[in-house]
Regions:
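Residue-level recognition of tetratricopeptide repeat
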Residues: 52, 86, 95, 174-175, ...
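"A position-specific structural signal for the A-helix of alpha-solenoid helical repeats
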Residues: 17, 51, 58, 65, ...
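Short coil/turn linking the two alpha-helices of tandem helical-hairpin repeats
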Residues: 87-88, 110, 152-155, 183, ...
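Alpha-solenoid helical repeat scaffolds
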Residues: 39-42, 77, 84, 120, ...
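TPR alpha-solenoid repeat register
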Residues: 55, 98, 132, 178, ...
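Helix-turn-helix repeat elements of alpha-solenoid scaffolds
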Residues: 24-40, 66-83, 111-127, 154-162, ...
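Residue-level signature for tetratricopeptide repeat
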Residues: 62, 105, 149-151, 185, ...
Length: 494
C-alpha cells in the first residue's frame, strides 16, 4: 500500500470513528459471546419479529467481527429493505445506524470509495438534524437503537443501555419502544446483586405499566410485569397478566419463556415445561430455554431424591430418578454447548447432577474446564471457585485446594450469597481443624484472614502470630501480619 492510499485510509478511519453504529459502541469481540449471539440473532430474524431490522444490523456487525463481510453486506441489505417498508416517512432517521455499519464493512473490505459514499449519504441525512458532528445525529432513534444493542450484548452494558433509553425519552417521552427498553434495562439490573437498582427493585414496575397504558397489546411487558408482581406477592394480578399474555402471543418464545418462569416459581413445573418445549419448537438452539427446562427437571429430581425408594433399582422411583437425571443432563448440556464462557450456571448445574448420580470424575472434568476459562465475570468466577472448592473438599478430600479456592472467592468483595458461602465454608473448615489440632498453622492462618475481613485487627494479629509459631517462614502470614500491625499502629496514633 503506497503512502497516498494509506493516508486516504487513515483519514477515512478518522471519519468512521465519529459514527454512531455497532462498530463504535462498547461491545467488541472480546466482550461478547459471538457464537451465542449469532444463534440468538438468527432466531430473532427467523421468527420475523417486529424489530427484525435491529437484529439484521447487529448480525452484520457480528459477521464482520468474524471476517464474514459478504454475509454482513447481505444482513445490511435486509435491514435497509425492512426499514424502508416499516418506516416510509422516517426511513432516513432510522437508517443512520445501518449506513454507518455499511461504511465500516466496506472499509474492512478495503472498498474505500463505497465506504466514503455511505459517509456522504450520512452527511446529507444528518445535516438538517444536528449542529454537531457531520456524519451522525444524536436523535432518539440513534440512542434507542444503541440501547437495544447494548442490552443484547452483555450485563456489563446494562447501565449504559439504560442511560441511552433515558436520552431517547427526553425528546420522545411517549415512545413505547424506548420506554420498554428503559424498563427492560431496569428489570435486568434489578436482578443483579449489588446494583443500586437491586436495592430499589420495583422501579421497573411503573415503567412496564406505562408501556401497557400506551400499548395494551405488548405481551412481553405483561409477563415481565407479572414476574415483578409475583416477586412482590401480588399473585392475583400477576396470574391474570400471564394468562392474558399467553392468549395474545401463544407462540412468541420470549413470552412463553417468561410465563414458564412464572409457573416454575409457582411450583407448577409441568406447565412450565410444556410452555418451554413449545418455545423450543420455534427456537431449537435457544440455550436459555434449555437451561430453564433443565431447572424444572432439577426441581422434580430433588423431590424424587427425598424418597428412600429412589435408591432401589427395582423400584419405579429409581427409574423415574434416572429418567430425570438424563433430562437434566441433556438440557443443561445443550444450554452451554455453544456458550461455555457465558452459561456458567448451566455448567455448574450439570456438574451438580453428575455428583448426585455418583459421576465424580465427569463433574471434576467440568470444574477443571471452568477453572481454565478466561474473560469470565467476577461473579461467575466466584460461583466456580465456591462449587469447585466444595468438590475438592468433599469428593477429592483435598483441603489445601478447597481452602485456596474459597479464599479466591472471598477476594471478590460483593457481599453476595456466594461470597458468604465461601466465608462460612472456610470458617467451618478452620474450626473443625482446630478442634482436632489447635496447632494447625493453615487453619490458624484462615481464622486470621477471616478476622481481618471482619475488621477485627487485634484478633487477626493474634491468629497470624500463632500461625507463624508453627510455620515461621510463611510469607503470606508475615505479609498479612506486617500490614495489620502498621494499620493497627496508625489507627492508635490518631
Amino acid at each position: 500500500m503506497n503512502t497516498m492510499s494509506k493516508t486516504v485510509r487513515e483519514l477515512l478511519k478518522e471519519k468512521l470513528d465519529q459514527l454512531q453504529c455497532h462498530f463504535t459502541w462498547g461491545p467488541q469481540k472480546e466482550t461478547i459471546d459471538l457464537d451465542d449471539m449469532m444463534y440468538r440473532l438468527q432466531d430473532s430474524i427467523d421468527l420475523n419479529l417486529k424489530y427484525k431490522a435491529r437484529s439484521c444490523n447487529q448480525f452484520a456487525f457480528v459477521n464482520s467481527l468474524q471476517g464474514n463481510y459478504e454475509e454482513a453486506i447481505q444482513n445490511l441489505k435486509e435491514a435497509e429493505k425492512i426499514l424502508r417498508e416499516n418506516y416510509k416517512d422516517a426511513f432516513e432517521r432510522r437508517s443512520i445506524i445501518t449506513y454507518g455499519n455499511y461504511a465500516w464493512v466496506h472499509y474492512h473490505m478495503g472498498q474505500l470509495t463505497e465506504a466514503q459514499s455511505y459517509l456522504d449519504k450520512l452527511e446529507m441525512i444528518c445535516k438538517p438534524l444536528t449542529d454537531g458532528p457531520r456524519y451522525t445525529a444524536m436523535i432518539p432513534e440513534v440512542y434507542g437503537e444503541k440501547g437495544w444493542s447494548l442490552l443484547r450484548s452483555a450485563a456489563q452494558y446494562y447501565e449504559e443501555a439504560m442511560e441511552c433509553f433515558e436520552k431517547a425519552l427526553e425528546e420522545d417521552p411517549n415512545n413505547t419502544e424506548w420506554i420498554m427498553g428503559f424498563a427492560t434495562a431496569l428489570y435486568r439490573l434489578e436482578a443483579i446483586p449489588g446494583t443500586p437498582e437491586k436495592c430499589k427493585s420495583s422501579q421497573s414496575v411503573n415503567h412496564l405499566r406505562r408501556v401497557l397504558e400506551l400499548d395494551p397489546e405488548e405481551s412481553l411487558a405483561m409477563v415481565m410485569l407479572a414476574l415483578k408482581l409475583q416477586e412482590n406477592k401480588q399473585k392475583k394480578e400477576a396470574n391474570e397478566l400471564v394468562q392474558q399474555a399467553l392468549q395474545k402471543s401463544p407462540d412468541v418464545p420470549k413470552v412463553l419463556r417468561n410465563a414458564a418462569k412464572f409457573y416454575r416459581l409457582e411450583q407448577a413445573g409441568e406447565k412450565a415445561i410444556e410452555l418451554l418445549k413449545k418455545a423450543l419448537g420455534r427456537t431449537p438452539h435457544n440455550s436459555v430455554l434449555h437451561d430453564q427446562i433443565g431447572m424444572c427437571y432439577r426441581v422434580q429430581l430433588l423431590e424424587v431424591f427425598k424418597n428412600p425408594l429412589s435408591s432401589d433399582p427395582q423400584n419405579p422411583e429409581f427409574q423415574q430418578k434416572m429418567v430425570l437425571i438424563d433430562h437434566c443432563k441433556h438440557h443443561f448440556g445443550k444450554a452451554f454447548e455453544h456458550r461455555p464462557r457465558t452459561a456458567i450456571k448451566s455448567q455448574l448445574d450439570y456438574a451438580d447432577i453428575c455428583l448426585r448420580n455418583g459421576e465424580n470424575s465427569k463433574a471434576g472434568e467440568v470444574y477443571s474446564k471452568l477453572l481454565e476459562l478466561e474473560g469470565i465475570s467476577p461473579e461467575n468466577m466466584q460461583r466456580i471457585w465456591l462449587q469447585a472448592g466444595l468438590f475438592q473438599l468433599h469428593k477429592r478430600k483435598s483441603d489445601s485446594n478447597a481452602v485456596q479456592l474459597f479464599q479466591k472467592g472471598l477476594k471478590i468483595e460483593n457481599n453476595s450469597k456466594v461470597w458468604k458461602m465461601c466465608y462460612e465454608n472456610l470458617d467451618k473448615w478452620a474450626e473443625k481443624k482446630l478442634c482436632r489440632d489447635s496447632h494447625d498453622s493453615k487453619a490458624l492462618g484462615v481464622k486470621g484472614l477471616l478476622h481481618q475481613i471482619d475488621g477485627d485487627k487485634s484478633k487477626a494479629i493474634e491468629y497470624f502470630e500463632e500461625a507463624l509459631e508453627f510455620d515461621p517462614s510463611n510469607e503470606e502470614y508475615l505479609s498479612a501480619l506486617c500490614e495489620l500491625r502498621l494499620s493497627f499502629e496508625e489507627h492508635h496514633d490518631l
